[in-house]
């Protein structure tokens, strides 16, 4: 299902309370520009989950897509790991 240069991210589901929408927190390591320390930066994305299959704390893969609402520009591709 390759669609050109669409970005993909892997993150954890931090909210599944909305219908057909999940909030995914993606953590990246960034070096501080002045001090050089590696800092964890968390970005939250709202993603479309058509079947409401992702649950809280699942590891999921999301892919960039067309704008689906005011905040949603990502969609669920697969659940990498179910929450324990």
UniProtKB/Swiss-Prot annotation:
Listed name of the protein: Small ribosomal subunit protein uS17
A cellular component term from Gene Ontology for this protein is: cytosolic small ribosomal subunit
Task: Give yes or no: UniProt keyword Cell inner membrane.
Answer: no
Q: Which family does it belong to?
A: Belongs to the universal ribosomal protein uS17 family.
- State whether it acts alone or in a complex, and with which partners, per the record: Part of the 30S ribosomal subunit.
The Gene Ontology terms for molecular function here are:
rRNA binding; structural constituent of ribosome
CDD domains tied to this protein: Ribosomal_uS17
Q: What keywords are assigned to this protein?
A: Ribonucleoprotein, Ribosomal protein, RNA-binding, rRNA-binding
| PANTHER family in alphabetical order | 40S RIBOSOMAL PROTEIN S11 FAMILY MEMBER (PTHR10744), SMALL RIBOSOMAL SUBUNIT PROTEIN US17M (PTHR10744:SF1)
What are its GO biological-process terms? translation
Q: Which domain of life is it from?
A: Bacteria
């Amino acid at each position: 299902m390759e669609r050109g240069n669409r970005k993909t991210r892997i993150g954890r589901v931090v909210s599944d309370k909305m219908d057909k929408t999940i909030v995914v927190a993606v953590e990246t390591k960034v070096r501080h520009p002045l001090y050089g320390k590696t800092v964890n930066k968390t970005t939250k994305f709202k993603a479309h989950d058509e079947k409401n299959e992702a649950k809280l704390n699942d590891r999921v893969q999301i892919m960039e897509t067309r704008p689906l609402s005011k905040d949603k520009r990502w969609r669920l591709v697969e659940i990498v790991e179910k929450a324990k």
